[in-house]
């Protein structure tokens, strides 16, 4: 190994450029440099490493013995690194020069290439222009050649057509001398095409010379007219031959032959005759038995007596069979005809106009409004129900046919046209039907009432009573509900038959007006019947009013009759209150029906809903007016009984008890007890029957009448102080009862009565103090003071004069 003092040239090269290539690692380079000088650098576990020498006793180990060698090695390595860097720099300079030289050559080459490419592009442009010019020339030549060929073919065809035209122009009606083309069945399509061309040319020429101005043109025109006639005859004969062949193929179900004939026939009037002929020969249009079978299917086993439900089921079955038949025909039409949509349009139109219309004509026999069918046979309602189901099922059939195919046919408009005569008069028939049902129901109710009257018997004429019908003809909410159900059914028919909002609204208003009339008339008549019972009771009361100078027997009989009249009045009162309650329920049902069903149909049209509300308000007002009259009569009935009880039960001694030293009676008088019991009993039904303002106004009026009646009654008596106490007890009893009226004004009046009764209780000198707190009762109190039994003896009159003077 060289020593550290050796010159650098003596040291071998330790570094090379390859050491720095690839994945360079300084640790690996360092290890390679010092590997020989520092074998322990490889680690204790390095394979083949000799064990360290044993230490020498007494000698100090060197600190780092290889430092000089390493220092020389590192200096030498640094020098090598500098040399390597210079080599690399030199090589880089050489590479840069070479790159610059190559770049210059490359740029020069690119410049020359660009010039060559530009020249090449110019050459291509000139070549493209030349090719385009040659192409245009070739295209023109081709067009000329094609035009020439076309002209040649046209000329050839024209020659042939002129030849054929001359054949048709030879002799009128003579088709025997025609070319074989026109009689060859294998060339029918070609013959048809040529015949149509000749016919078109000849007809055009005849039309152009229709008014000849010269002899020559006239002769030419007459010659072509012969050709036109012969061509027409030939076309007709050819068309008939094709139709016959088409029919034969149709019977054999030879689709290809049918399609061939249909294609050829399409040249004659666009194939209209073939289409119409095919549709007309369908079995459902020519079989005479189909009509009778159809009507049997619709009516079922019940025959002419079939109801609308059976008819609806029958129509569903029949229309399904028709739709299936059309669907099968559509399959054939699609496979045979070149214009299947036109054929389907003709077929569907024929189905609706012939087969469906024939069925509907049998079903929808419009009745006469002047001579309505009997209600036992269904009346007008049967016709309307059948009309609705027929319209509904026919619309379903139309939708089904449209889904199959109907071409450009306006199937919806065609369906509507079938029913137009029925829809034009629908509203009149619906109104007449509702009136007929109402009249029938009223006749039924009258018959039931008569039967009930006959079964229960009549009140004997010996007691002077007449037969009443109010109990048998009471208002029924069930009947009103039935009216609403009729109207709801009619409205459902109306919305089914019509779709335009304005038309629907107009018809709905007319139909709803029938319900308003029916409910108003029924309720008003029911209230009038109930009022008749009140009138009858009033007549009974008036009949048995007698004078004072009669025998005991007559008086007893009259009293018994008055009791009977009172019982009749109470019964009539209850009946009328029940009638009013049912009226209120019926009107509520009517209003609910209007809100739920009628309103939504009227709101889309301006003014329709407010007008209907006004109509309903007018109808309800009529019922309310009748109810108001009856309620006033009820008050008269109650007050008449109150007056009778006051007259018969109130004794003079009730308020003028003898001064015998006995304790005063603080109980109400018998008349008061009887009246309060009567009012409690009779008004119980009124409390439950009346509601809201009706109840409030009725009880307020009754309270005012009761107050006035009691005042007038008490002015017939003379009162002692103890009688005044008893009067006050009566007033308290009456006041407690009328408090159930919930009428503050009535409560106040009876409270003032209680205060006013004090004029009979206080001493004469204390009367003036009674008016200080309540001056409003002064006028009535002054009248009551005169009823004191000591009015004259206590000189109360002079005392009152001084009070009035003050």
Swiss-Prot record:
GO CC terms, sorted: cytosol; exocyst; extracellular exosome
Biological processes annotated in GO: exocytosis; Golgi to plasma membrane transport; protein transport
Positions in coiled-coil regions: 77-109
Keyword terms of this UniProt record: Coiled coil, Exocytosis, Protein transport, Transport
InterPro entries: Sec10-like, Sec10_HB, Sec10_N
UniProt cross-references to Pfam families, sorted A to Z: Sec10_HB (PF07393), Sec10_N (PF20667)
Similarity comment text for this entry: Belongs to the SEC10 family.
Subunit-level organization: The exocyst complex is composed of EXOC1, EXOC2, EXOC3, EXOC4, EXOC5, EXOC6, EXOC7 and EXOC8.
Function: Component of the exocyst complex involved in the docking of exocytic vesicles with fusion sites on the plasma membrane.
Protein name per the record: Exocyst complex component 5
Native source organism of the sequence: Oryza sativa subsp. japonica
